[in-house]
């Protein structure tokens, strides 16, 4: 992706119901209710399924990923995920 190109100019990388794996540790940035800021929500290598696709700041996609082992649905950016 070039600097002047927005992620939203392209189709989403992941599809609904696609199995994905986390590429990094995900901590609460304050947007996950009931957990303290900085608390671990999911660890690198955990797997889940894309259950929703939204946008962030009109520049990038946010993928709602259901981490079945934890019972959480967390928002992830493309760089935090990989296909299984």
Where are these regions (language model features)?
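Basic/aromatic-rich interaction segments and small domains that mediate binding to polyanionic partners
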Residues: 2-84
